[in-house]
Amino acid sequence: MADFIGAVDQGTTSTRFMIFDHGGNEVAKHQLEHEQILPRSGWVEHDPVEIWERTNSVMQNALRNGGLSGTDLAAIGITNQRETTVVWDPRTGRPYYNAIVWQDTRTDAIAANLERSGRGDVIRRKAGLPPATYFSGGKIQWILENVDGVREAAEQGHAVFGNTDSWVLWNLTGGPDGGIHATDVTNASRTMLMNLETLDWDDELLGFFGIPRGMLPTINPSSHPEAFGTTRTSRPLRAAVPITGVLGDQHAATVGQVCFSPGEAKNTYGTGNFLVLNTGTELVRSQHGLLTTVAYQFGDNPPVYALEGSIAVTGSAVQWLRDQMKIIKTAAESEELARTVEDNGGMYFVPAFSGLFAPYWRSDARGAIVGLARYNDNAHLARATLEAICYQSRDVVVAMEQDSSVHLDVLRVDGGVTANDLCMQIQADILGVPVSRPVVAETTALGAAYAAGLATGFWRHTDELRTHWSESRRWEPQWSEERRAQGYAGWKMAVERTLDWVKVPES
């Protein structure tokens, strides 16, 4: 058997290809960013063709960096930014429109009307999700209704939908020449279109959005030896390599953090934050603003479910300090600047740029800086930004404990923001529990590799994967209970100030 597993990690801001050995160690990687297209306020798009070109480049360059060829790979996995919606012509591979990104809020009227009509309760019961701009169903509906010719093309079988996992998979396996149009249960569970109990597209839900069933990819387990086909030799690997694992990014990170037992949780800090709690084979329906989702499904085994708290803006708030406010030149400088003050100076920053996700689900919210005094400066804003990342995670942890009665003993963390040591210390202080960062920080790509390797026998069992995990650093809480309570009370007041800011239109 070949000695390595590859993983495509198609993210919100970049695409990377990583190669791992039997010990789960990184052997080689390459990463490229892609353009963030912002045509209007609240609209966020990506160019699907650019994403596919970046995927080609990173796969070729990672192999070159490692001195490897495609034949050295036993299999590859794919992980991706979830919910981001691509609709393309399967005859040509040409997208009908840019990919509408998960952060995009143009479908707020669609979501509001679903709620007003009472259909929101059906979506929650069947799909485990609230009607929100976040998910794919409304984005597909928007394209069908607003892009000329797409509705007619869909009815004729000439327009298909996929999240970026399906888009990359279809292209890797041949594109117009027999490419496989498929997805996995984790990505499908983020569309508002899949029934969590049947793991199939639900005709009633499809009817809510007016989506023809023929547009949709086949739903497969997250790890399977045959369901996703093989790469074409004409494609970037120049070899026929089995594609045996596909998971949405947060599900992949859950696998990469080896959260295989009920009650185990991880928090990924990236563009947004995503806290996922494994609930086992039990489907737990949230009563406190969380999402019920599929954590993963390996082969023919029953699906494992999870509760998730999705936060739209965390790491991207630091990017805002850099790109819009220009008070730092690099994201890493946020830590240095924030360390020059002892606290937030009474100032709170709620980065509700596109509304608030879990546990509030308020598309009418917008960002706010409150408690501002003449005393405050850029350092206080940097500190308040890091605290906002951590307070939003506390909101989710509180909801998770209410839904599951599970009290976290430690929070496992991963993602780019975890390189910010001050932010992780603040997180431990705000939660009052230790925060643990693993040695291998690229848990999203690693999880996709694990899913692919389990399907091929590269790794035998999840217990073997547990032996790969080790802690790099742990942060212990340092705040007093009084400071923790006062700080959180101030945060909750600040959140209240952001609500009812935007009138959600009726379609």
UniProtKB/Swiss-Prot annotation:
One of its GO terms (cellular component) is cytosol. This is Glycerol kinase 1. InterPro entries: ATPase_NBD (IPR043129), Carb_kinase_FGGY (IPR000577), Carb_kinase_FGGY_CS (IPR018483), FGGY_C (IPR018485), FGGY_N (IPR018484), Glycerol_kin (IPR005999). Glycerol binds at R82, E83, Y134, D249, Q250. NCBIfam families: glycerol_kin, PRK00047.1. Key enzyme in the regulation of glycerol uptake and metabolism. Catalyzes the phosphorylation of glycerol to yield sn-glycerol 3-phosphate. PROSITE patterns: FGGY_KINASES_1 (PS00933), FGGY_KINASES_2 (PS00445). Sn-glycerol 3-phosphate binds at T12, R82, E83, Y134, D249. Pathway: Polyol metabolism; glycerol degradation via glycerol kinase pathway; sn-glycerol 3-phosphate from glycerol: step 1/1. Belongs to the FGGY kinase family. Its EC number is 2.7.1.30. It catalyses: glycerol + ATP = sn-glycerol 3-phosphate + ADP + H(+). Keywords: ATP-binding, Glycerol metabolism, Kinase, Nucleotide-binding, Transferase. It comes from the Bacteria. ATP binds at T12, T13, S14, T271, G315, Q319, G416. One of its GO terms (biological process) is glycerol catabolic process. It is an enzyme of class 2 (transferase). ADP binds at T12, R16, T271, G315, G416, N420. SUPFAM superfamilies: Actin-like ATPase domain. GO terms for molecular function: ATP binding; glycerol kinase activity. Inhibited by fructose 1,6-bisphosphate (FBP).
